Amino acid sequence: EISECLVGSEMCIRDRPRGIEGLIADANKHGIKFGIWIEPEMANTTSELYEKHPEWVLKAPNREIVLGRGGTQVVLDLSNPEVQDFIFGIVDNLMTTYPEIDYIKWDANMSILNHGSQYLPSDQQSHMYIEYHEGFKKVCERIRAKYPDLTLQACASGGGRANYGVMPYFDEFWVSDNTDALQRIYMQWGTSYFFPAIAMASHISAAPNHQTFRVIPLKYRIDVAMSGRLGMEIQPKNMTEEEKTLCRKAIADYKTIRPVVQFGDIYRLVSPYDRLGVASLMYTSPEKDKAVFYWWKTEHFVNQHLP
């Protein structure tokens, strides 16, 4: 388990004396590709990075800095080329040291609340947000140029990075921290108007759900997750053998329909927002010779006549 150590400090491992090498070895032993969750745009006011470079964080002049998680989190100023080099170096060092890394979840758990750059001159402060994202883009371009086969997920407390600007550099984005399957039907329905299924990370999560505390049958959670880019957000050690068998079958089935779901055309058949008690959509292959049909019951009505 990678500990929740200070963002901006050296990565630390708790209860893993073999370090990341040991985690990668364990993953390889079980035939699993290894991925890691990082948050390179963030720092903490109590971290080594902040102590060395307090001028690297976003901060409005003559204002007290607004802090995020834990009362210490801050956002690094990506308009600053030195910060760009530092953030690229985080990924580059990881990939150079551990070339077996196949996947990176790039998180950002604080919005830009301090609207000021300590790097930009006063006459460019109004462009801070634009310059931040231009710097972010430069970092992404460097990562993609050097590691074209690395799978990257854009994650920002959920869907904060769901935009066309990051899609050239990331393979998928995290739709929402809310993985409640019933609510995901609504969220993914709306998201599908703007983004294809291949971009929507859609994961099977535990029950009770960690956000809504709702208990939803595993089969229902699987069926909803399979309508996007399928993943698992659940601890195998907490699953029964029956549940593991069901998930193994779901993953195998998804691999057969994946080309249609991720590269096909979408047909919206019944919107969950119509409040008919059901939602339904269908993907078809470009040649229209294959189709995948989804149908979910969303509400219970007396004497309900289903389409």
Question: What would you call each of these model-derived segments?
Answer:
Residues 272-307:
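Carbohydrate-binding surface patches
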Residues 49-85, 130-238:
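Glycan-recognition surfaces
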Residues 27, 87, 107, 152, ...:
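Conserved, mostly hydrophobic/aromatic
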Residues 1-8, 12-13:
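Single conserved hydrophobic/aromatic residue that forms the stacking wall/gate
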Residues 76-106:
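An active-site-proximal structural segment forming one wall of the substrate-binding cleft
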